[in-house]
């Protein structure tokens, strides 16, 4: 997200349910190695979510709701403001579904906030925070249903950046911090003679870092980046 790695340390990969459309202004897909900008895990490519911002003065509020089969509900409310050099984005969402089988429910709460300030015509500051919590249940295979296969996961991220834009050159220095709290019950299969689990898997992870890059364009279809 905005060039910052998002994998959960204990799993070594992102938790996809922690990312919602309320974050995204656009999604960039880069093919091939990109470790200079995105770190050592970007050996094969990168999917980068660029967060929302307001590009012109004014106030905009967007409400999205949807309802479908299996009691599926999607909701999202976003307010964006830009006044002079100041801008802000505040979003909240709630999503849920019963799933197409028993013990397959999913419920998610999410919130995102961002503020920005253009110090000059070429330099700006921004800070943001995103927190998501979801509850999910896994019913196991149809032939051997699983009970109590539940998980409760909370993940968050925050960052602060100083950015510059001079036409032919642009860059940023950013600081980021990600965290997650995971509570997982592996469940049990009654048809296999199993009983309820005596313990739960619980983990907490966090990751922080600094990212810097500067890009320059000297002629058409060319870009040189250091970072």
What are these regions, as identified by a protein language model?
Residues 43-45, 59-63, 73-77, 109-113, ...:
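Hydrophobic, lipid-facing positions within transmembrane beta-strands of outer-membrane proteins
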Residues 27-29, 47-49, 162:
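N-terminal secretion/transport leader regions
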Residues 61-63, 88-90, 125-127, 171-175, ...:
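Transmembrane beta-strands of outer-membrane beta-barrel proteins
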Residues 4-31:
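Short acidic/polar hinge/loop motifs at secondary-structure boundaries
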Residues 97-104, 108, 124-207:
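Flexible loop and strand-edge segments within Gram-negative outer membrane beta-barrel domains
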Residues 81-83, 117, 162-166, 206, ...:
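Residue-level signature of outer-membrane beta-barrel architecture
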Residues 56, 83-86, 120-122, 132, ...:
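Outer-membrane beta-barrel channels and translocator barrels
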Residues 34, 46, 51-81, 91-92, ...:
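Short strand-turn segments of transmembrane beta-barrel domains in outer membranes
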